[in-house]
Amino acid sequence: MATAKTIDLTGKAVGEVELPAVFDADYRPDLIKKAVLAAQANRLQPYGPRLYSGMETSARGWGSGRGVSHVPRLVNSSRAARVPHAKGGRRAHPPKPEADRSEKVNTKERRYAIRSAIAATTDPTLVSLRGHIFEAELPIVAVNDLESLERTKQVIEFLEAAGLYEDVLRAKYGRHIRAGRGKLRGRKYKHKKSVLIVAGENTPILKAARNLSGVDVVTVDSLNAELLAPGTHAGRLTVWTESAIGKLEGAFQ
């Protein structure tokens, strides 16, 4: 069974911990992508136009004999209305609010995707390909004292000592305005993901680190493929606590 060094809050190695079998899972980018896309699809809200959008007009057709197309026209005007190719008219085939856009993933596939994404966090090549900046040896396992940190300043000091804070700064200054119409729809900026911190239990670290740019903090029970592989790309820079490593034993089987 593979082992990993354990670091304290100053970034120094203080021991070793045996890694559970989940870290030996095969890399399956196809299953990871399938699980992440399903999670994103299942968050979608129903959307579509109002039932009478583009139809609320008194337009009517002129009929034959005028040498013009047979389209509804506004009263006392020759301007076309209501039809899809007219300004302000209805859409031809709009999205239907009643459509089922959810996606299903087999339970065994979903669990295997999580195991594969967990194993990918130990591969320096995959982590580097995601753009993460780090100096520490992977996987990064911290002592349980990390879970008791209550202030964001303390978390920053730990990340600096572990050689991970540069990645947080990369996410902080990497925010940029998105291209396209999404700017008008409540998603003006695109944000980068940085460090994922996984704790064993619901401890103070979950609140202390959550306001750092790009940082996500979760318990083992809340892990999913999207947290481990944002945008379907596996190899997220992840910090595990000793208790989290212990809870991974036999998990997601």
Curated annotation (Swiss-Prot):
GO cellular component terms, A-Z: cytosolic large ribosomal subunit
Coiled-coil stretches: none
UniProt biased composition (Basic and acidic residues): 95-107
InterPro entries: Ribosomal_uL4, Ribosomal_uL4_dom_sf, Ribosomal_uL4_euk/arc_CS, Ribosomal_uL4_euk/arch, Ribosomall_uL4-arc
PROSITE patterns: RIBOSOMAL_L1E
Statement: the UniProt record of this protein carries the keyword RNA-binding: yes
Keyword annotations of the record: Ribonucleoprotein, Ribosomal protein, RNA-binding, rRNA-binding
Chain positions covered by the region annotation Disordered: 78-107
Pfam families (UniProt xref): Ribosomal_L4 (PF00573)
Molecular functions (GO terms): RNA binding; rRNA binding; structural constituent of ribosome
Function: One of the primary rRNA binding proteins, this protein initially binds near the 5'-end of the 23S rRNA. It is important during the early stages of 50S assembly. It makes multiple contacts with different domains of the 23S rRNA in the assembled 50S subunit and ribosome. Forms part of the polypeptide exit tunnel.
NCBIfam families: rpl4p_arch (TIGR03672)
Record note on quaternary structure: Part of the 50S ribosomal subunit.
PANTHER family, A to Z: 60S RIBOSOMAL PROTEIN L4 (PTHR19431)
Protein name: Large ribosomal subunit protein uL4
Organism: Methanosarcina acetivorans (strain ATCC 35395 / DSM 2834 / JCM 12185 / C2A)
Record lineage: Archaea, Methanobacteriati, Methanobacteriota, Stenosarchaea group, Methanomicrobia
